[in-house]
Swiss-Prot record:
UniProt-recorded name of the protein: Serine/threonine-protein kinase chk1
Listed SMART domains: S_TKc
Any one GO biological process: negative regulation of transcription by RNA polymerase II
Record-listed E.C. numbers: 2.7.11.1
One Gene Ontology MF term: protein serine/threonine kinase activity
UniProt-annotated catalytic positions: 137 (proton acceptor)
Lineage of origin: Eukaryota, Fungi, Dikarya, Ascomycota, Taphrinomycotina
Record domain Protein kinase: where: 10-272
Function: Serine/threonine-protein kinase which is required for checkpoint-mediated cell cycle arrest and activation of DNA repair in response to the presence of DNA damage or unreplicated DNA. May also negatively regulate cell cycle progression during unperturbed cell cycles. Binds to and phosphorylates CDC25. This leads to negative regulation of CDC25 and prevents mitotic entry.
Domain of life: Eukaryota
Length: 496
């Protein structure tokens, strides 16, 4: 899109996300305040669906988001406008990035950290439901963080009004992501109860770094086993949960929506009402630096033990489907507009006079590949904000001193072992590998691996997700990087 629009009151910066017919860009005003602005190409949108249907959906999304404005755990809606070509929606920019980018797959986060974030999630959902609004698409991609590490619920694209002026109605649109969707979603359902179910799956994922099943259908393996044990599972990884966490999760994941916990039951559960050191009286983060440090200390990629296997693989040893989706003609065009959090400018070559070691010593992503406790403690001593330790940029990246040709050869070898096909493109000083695959839950993962020369004999290799579950994308990143290993992956800032 053009960098200037008639009557658009902001300066347009870099793109941070894309959708089927929308693009999200960082924009800033004359006071340098940053916003996330969603631009919808009206011609493209109305070519994919009836113009009237699209207009109603867009109006509903905006109206319901505005209705839920004003809560600290919901992304703020500022305004919307349009011209003949574009419709734009101005939203709060979540400077802390994506919560689930900071969670280790198959490991999860510490229970007190999970309790803090789940309490904020339920505060946001309680507020939405008090307005009669069901989100209906609660999943990791829609849970963001602000600059102090507080949780923000985003994306009202599937939201619906289930209650108005004291009168409730059942909903009937089968929406949401399969691993997080309630079993009754294919029938008429209570919008508030499907949100509770999704929150239960999210809490499970926070604590254990995975979802309990592909989807809640009675003939699928993991969910069938759950049902056979009368929804009181004792097998791995359920047996890793504390009694309190087990109680609240199983209460939220009752297949019968009439027996399932309501939001009121959830927020009054003893596990959630117990104190946590991270929570202030008003529910905000009490110590952003300590919270960021705890999150980062859980992230670890052991390059001394290369592996291509997921601990709960179902398709093959890698955990990814052997039959990968073929690229469609439009896929590469869509992937050219990739999702990248961070500064308003693209990565550029570093100044020749810059001390590269000093730059790398401040990059938290390096802590994944070393004994990270000392690394994180050094950062924490100087940090004043959450994002100085947990950056908004995705952590699925690494540096290398190897030549680009060598790095690409190793990437291709690793992706071949995972049975993932790749296409490649050159853009200025970058090489971009386009990847398209299904994760072990049979959900689509799309993104790019972007190689950028920073100068100083240094390459940045960035795995940038466009579509899919952040936990599964990080698992894919770990599998690839672990198979590449040392000395390609830079683990020591003094490494030559």
């Amino acid at each position: 899109m053009a960098q200037k629009l008639d009557n658009f009151p902001y300066h347009i910066g870099r793109e941070i996300g894309t959708g089927a017919f929308a693009s999200v860009r960082l924009c800033y005003d004359d006071n340098a305040k940053i916003y996330a602005v969603k631009f919808v190409n009206k011609k493209h949108a109305t070519s994919c669906m009836n113009a009237g249907v699209w207009a109603r959906r867009m109006a509903s999304e905006i109206q319901l988001h505005k209705l839920c404005n004003g809560h600290k755990n919901i992304i703020h809606f500022y305004n919307t406008a349009e011209n003949p070509q574009w419709r734009w929606v101005v939203l709060e920019f979540a400077q802390g990035g994506d919560l689930f980018d900071k969670i280790e797959p198959d490991v999860g986060i510490d229970e007190d950290v999970a309790q803090f974030y789940f309490a904020q999630l339920m505060e946001g959902i309680s507020f939405m439901h008090s307005k009669g609004v069901a989100h209906r698409d609660l999943k990791p991609e829609n849970i963001l963080l602000d600059y102090n590490g507080n949780l923000k619920i985003s994306d009202f694209g599937f939201a619906s009004l289930f209650s108005y002026k004291g009168k409730s109605r059942l909903l009937n649109s089968p929406v949401g992501s399969p691993p997080y969707a309630a079993p009754e979603i294919t029938q008429q359902y209570d919008g508030s109860k499907v949100d509770v179910w999704s929150c239960g799956i999210i809490l499970f994922a926070l604590l254990l770094g995975n979802t309990p099943w592909d989807e809640a259908i009675s003939n699928t393996g993991d969910y069938l086993l759950y049902k056979k044990q009368c929804e009181r599972p004792s097998y791995h990884p359920w047996n890793l949960l504390s009694p309190g966490a087990y109680s609240i999760i199983t209460g939220m994941l009752r297949s019968d929506p009439f027996k399932r916990y309501s939001v009121k039951h959830v927020v009054q559960h003893p596990w959630l009402t117990s104190s946590t050191p991270f929570r202030t009286k008003n529910g905000n983060c009490a110590d952003p630096v300590a919270l960021a440090s705890r999150l980062m200390l859980k992230l670890r990629i052991d390059l001394d033990k290369p592996r291509l296997a997921s601990s709960r693989a179902s398709q093959n040893d890698s955990g990814f489907s052997m039959t990968q989706p073929a690229f469609k003609k439009n896929d590469q065009k869509e992937l050219d507009r990739v999702e990248v959090y961070g500064a308003l400018s693209q990565p550029v070559q570093l100044n020749k006079n810059i001390d590269v070691t000093e730059i790398l010593e401040k990059d938290p992503s390096l802590s994944q590949f070393c004994e990270n406790e000392g690394f994180i403690k050094r950062l924490a001593k100087k940090a004043k904000n959450f994002y100085e330790i947990c950056p908004p940029e995705r952590l699925t990246r690494f540096y290398s001193r190897a030549s680009r040709e060598t790095i690409i050869d190793h990437l291709y070898d690793s992706l071949r072992l995972l049975a993932i096909s790749v296409t490649m493109k050159y853009v200025r000083n970058q090489t971009i590998l386009y990847v398209n695959l299904h994760d072990k839950r049979k959900c689509l993962l799309q993104g790019v691996i972007e190689l950028t020369n920073l100068g100083h004999n240094l390459e940045l290799i960035n795995f940038i997700k466009r579509n899919g579950d952040p936990l599964e994308w990080r698992k894919f990143f770990k599998n690839v990087v672990s198979s590449i290993g040392k000395p390609i992956v830079l683990t020591d800032v003094s490494q030559n």
